[in-house]
Amino acid sequence: MTIIRKKHPLIKIINHSFIDLPTPSNISSWWNFGSLLGLCLIIQILTGLFLAMHYTSDTSTAFSSVTHICRDVNYGWLIRYMHANGASMFFICLFLHVGRGMYYGSYNMIETWNMGIVLLFAVMATAFMGYVLPWGQMSFWGATVITNLLSAIPYIGTTLVEWIWGGFSVDKATLTRFFAFHFILPFIITALVFVHLLFLHETGSNNPTGLNSDADKIPFHPYYTIKDFLGVLILLMGLMILVLFFPDVLGDPDNYTPANPLNTPAHIKPEWYFLFAYAILRSIPNKLGGVLALILSILILALLPLLHTSKQRGLTFRPITQTMYWILVADLLILTWIGGQPVEYPFIIIGQMASIAYFAIIVILMPMAGMIENNILNLD
């Protein structure tokens, strides 16, 4: 068996990636989220495949086809809610994975980090298009509002929006193409995941100390396969509690009303995992400025390697930057809350303050804290 594992052209790739992979001996549970994201992707592809067997991407039948899945298909309700809540679990794992990378300085592995940012954009695009497919009120108006943002692009904006819509409004053509893209993107994401892993295995994993761990490596299997399996059990338990007891807690009641272009919902808002970016978008009165801020809210992650000023890699031994980091986390929670609130006083000003704080902490305060800590270390 050992000979096959190490010699077979196909199996040896798996062997070098998941079995004999030299791994730092001290990586904590924060390193579990990579494998959990892989699990989420598999769950989403499988449940999505079975949903696609019964779904029809036509404006006249899309809403009723989802109802049909829930009522008439064997365990259709389970597949549908696993897919919807699986997306939420996916984003929880994504945010924790990115947060771990920021805390421990994993962004210094630049190729892996940039590939991760591309993956984040791809997953966000997929989730957005998936939200349009049930063709409820929030699906329709969410699609209208978000695609309309592209009209802020000078000169070509309006033409671009109509090209994406396939007409003069969000309609049948839009729904059909969104379904096509929503189906293909997870497979593109899977390919990108392998590239992400390829870059990661070039450098090896980071660890909580931020130090070189070449002198202290252990094989991935059985140590981290067992550890990852525990994470898998916890994730699946959390997902099934959500699906079986609170399936609609993260959804919007408006999406149980069929799409109606003549009736605008009181508060148009995306799923909870986009609310922080939506709050940043809304906090700028200018349309183009809002769109740029929205894109920058994610793209700013690519600047982290350039903004790293500390002599140490992670935040483990850096209390000042640690404080800034946790203020940033609190700020993101505030933005998420604001994104779900109506556009009125005092939410507008809170959103604007939180948006300024978000960019200021990342671009100014954290690099400054790193330099202050360097100076403290130099004091005799």
Curated annotation (Swiss-Prot):
<feature type="binding site" description="axial binding residue">
    <location>
        <position position="97"/>
    </location>
    <ligand>
        <name>heme b b566</name>
    </ligand>
</feature>
<dbReference type="GO" id="GO:0005743">
    <property type="term" value="C:mitochondrial inner membrane"/>
</dbReference>
<keyword id="KW-0496">Mitochondrion</keyword>
<feature type="transmembrane region" description="Helical">
    <location>
        <begin position="113"/>
        <end position="133"/>
    </location>
</feature>
<feature type="transmembrane region" description="Helical">
    <location>
        <begin position="77"/>
        <end position="98"/>
    </location>
</feature>
<keyword id="KW-0249">Electron transport</keyword>
<keyword id="KW-0679">Respiratory chain</keyword>
<feature type="binding site" description="axial binding residue">
    <location>
        <position position="83"/>
    </location>
    <ligand>
        <name>heme b b562</name>
    </ligand>
</feature>
<keyword id="KW-0812">Transmembrane</keyword>
<dbReference type="GO" id="GO:0045275">
    <property type="term" value="C:respiratory chain complex III"/>
</dbReference>
<dbReference type="Pfam" id="PF00033">
    <property type="entry name" value="Cytochrome_B"/>
</dbReference>
<dbReference type="InterPro" id="IPR030689">
    <property type="entry name" value="Cytochrome_b"/>
</dbReference>
<dbReference type="GO" id="GO:0008121">
    <property type="term" value="F:ubiquinol-cytochrome-c reductase activity"/>
</dbReference>
<dbReference type="GO" id="GO:0046872">
    <property type="term" value="F:metal ion binding"/>
</dbReference>
<comment type="subunit">
    <text>The cytochrome bc1 complex contains 11 subunits: 3 respiratory subunits (MT-CYB, CYC1 and UQCRFS1), 2 core proteins (UQCRC1 and UQCRC2) and 6 low-molecular weight proteins (UQCRH/QCR6, UQCRB/QCR7, UQCRQ/QCR8, UQCR10/QCR9, UQCR11/QCR10 and a cleavage product of UQCRFS1). This cytochrome bc1 complex then forms a dimer.</text>
</comment>
<dbReference type="InterPro" id="IPR016174">
    <property type="entry name" value="Di-haem_cyt_TM"/>
</dbReference>
<dbReference type="InterPro" id="IPR036150">
    <property type="entry name" value="Cyt_b/b6_C_sf"/>
</dbReference>
<feature type="binding site">
    <location>
        <position position="201"/>
    </location>
    <ligand>
        <name>a ubiquinone</name>
    </ligand>
</feature>
<feature type="transmembrane region" description="Helical">
    <location>
        <begin position="347"/>
        <end position="367"/>
    </location>
</feature>
<keyword id="KW-0830">Ubiquinone</keyword>
<keyword id="KW-1133">Transmembrane helix</keyword>
<feature type="transmembrane region" description="Helical">
    <location>
        <begin position="320"/>
        <end position="340"/>
    </location>
</feature>
<feature type="transmembrane region" description="Helical">
    <location>
        <begin position="33"/>
        <end position="53"/>
    </location>
</feature>
<dbReference type="Pfam" id="PF00032">
    <property type="entry name" value="Cytochrom_B_C"/>
</dbReference>
<dbReference type="InterPro" id="IPR005797">
    <property type="entry name" value="Cyt_b/b6_N"/>
</dbReference>
<keyword id="KW-0472">Membrane</keyword>
<comment type="similarity">
    <text>Belongs to the cytochrome b family.</text>
</comment>
<keyword id="KW-0999">Mitochondrion inner membrane</keyword>
<feature type="transmembrane region" description="Helical">
    <location>
        <begin position="288"/>
        <end position="308"/>
    </location>
</feature>
<feature type="binding site" description="axial binding residue">
    <location>
        <position position="196"/>
    </location>
    <ligand>
        <name>heme b b566</name>
    </ligand>
</feature>
<feature type="binding site" description="axial binding residue">
    <location>
        <position position="182"/>
    </location>
    <ligand>
        <name>heme b b562</name>
    </ligand>
</feature>
<comment type="function">
    <text>Component of the ubiquinol-cytochrome c reductase complex (complex III or cytochrome b-c1 complex) that is part of the mitochondrial respiratory chain. The b-c1 complex mediates electron transfer from ubiquinol to cytochrome c. Contributes to the generation of a proton gradient across the mitochondrial membrane that is then used for ATP synthesis.</text>
</comment>
<dbReference type="InterPro" id="IPR048259">
    <property type="entry name" value="Cytochrome_b_N_euk/bac"/>
</dbReference>
<keyword id="KW-0349">Heme</keyword>
<keyword id="KW-0813">Transport</keyword>
<protein>
    <recommendedName>
        <fullName>Cytochrome b</fullName>
    </recommendedName>
</protein>
<keyword id="KW-0479">Metal-binding</keyword>
<dbReference type="InterPro" id="IPR048260">
    <property type="entry name" value="Cytochrome_b_C_euk/bac"/>
</dbReference>
<dbReference type="InterPro" id="IPR027387">
    <property type="entry name" value="Cytb/b6-like_sf"/>
</dbReference>
<feature type="transmembrane region" description="Helical">
    <location>
        <begin position="178"/>
        <end position="198"/>
    </location>
</feature>
<dbReference type="GO" id="GO:0006122">
    <property type="term" value="P:mitochondrial electron transport, ubiquinol to cytochrome c"/>
</dbReference>
<dbReference type="InterPro" id="IPR005798">
    <property type="entry name" value="Cyt_b/b6_C"/>
</dbReference>
